[in-house]
Amino acid sequence: MAKTNTGRWLAGAAGLAAVGSVAGVSVARAVTRRTTDDDPHHGEDFGLLDADRSYVVTTPDGVPLAVREVGPADAPLTVVFAHGFCLRMGAFHFQRARLTAQWGPQVRMVFYDHRGHGQSGDAPSDTFTVSQLGQDLEAVLAVMAPRGPVVLVGHSMGGMTVLSHARQYPKRYGNRIVGVALISSAAEGVSRSPLGEILRNPALEAARFAVRYAPKTVHRTRGAARSVIGPILRAASYGDEKISPSVVAFSEKMMHDTPIATLVGFLHALEVHDETPALKTLAKIPTLIVCGDRDLLTPKEYSESMAEALPKSELLIIGGAGHLVQLEQPELVDDALVRLVERATPSKLVAITRRLRDRARNHG
């Protein structure tokens, strides 16, 4: 029996690794071509967020979440960013860098790492669920934004986190939470995307079993699990082969640094989550839905489906972009976030615009 299971495990790993290698070859070719061109982000300080004001928010079950903050503590609006699967808050690097100047003192931005990701603490594998992530977001909001209007921005699993929060805390929306952006995300499990095929791989099942029931042996499944998921994640990240090599290296490091227990632990959550009831709550407020038309992990059909259910949504499909659209096409994403804030807080933005015009006139 054990021999048969081992054979199935190896065959499954080889089969999915072959699928992954096809994607990996396309990435390797693209990266090779990219390195021959000028890199617009050579020398970029991707550690910018690490220098911002630092806090730790401890969840009710005792997990320390790393938090960064930029902007005045008394800003009229707070924008909270939730990153995606196998990433960390740095995935919003360009939003942090550019929107700080765009919004100035009128907006405070808060970023945090999910449990098991980045600089946040580890957690039991049975807490690696989308519902738990929604509760973690509530813990961050309770400490970092206890008063005043808030806009939530979620990328990939971070978008699912926002949806989970909306399902569990619907009374927060329309009153405290005045706008939401869902970037490269989905309201229900991603079993219909290429990621869904990966989730059924015996290699990942073995790693998931080790994480849950034999954590001391998880290192034995590390290589097989990464060989299955890694190439797919890398291939799906960017749609344009002209993407900056520095940006590619930055995102790949985030993925590589994610603990294997986190990687396999959250995969099942991505497959089975269903936050479609949250769409009824989000229908009350302005929303932004963004997706690249070359996103292989959360294809644009997921975004289009959410937009149909949200009458106050702006749907932005970015041509040629992959799953990490906020790193690949930051200007388009940033502009869309500015529009969302303007729609979510129109009265405040009118006053802000008037003050800026008066200031410019006085200095003219």
Cite the ranges covered by each PLM segment:
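Hydrophobic alpha-helical topogenic segments used for membrane insertion/localization
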Residues: 5-32
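Conserved HGGG/HGGXW glycine-rich cap/lid loop of the alpha/beta-hydrolase fold
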Residues: 63, 68-122, 143
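Active-site loop/oxyanion-hole signature of alpha/beta-hydrolase fold enzymes
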Residues: 108-160, 167-173, 335
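Flexible "cap/lid" loop of the alpha/beta hydrolase fold
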Residues: 167, 171-220
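Conserved alpha/beta-hydrolase catalytic His-Asp/Glu region
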Residues: 216-281
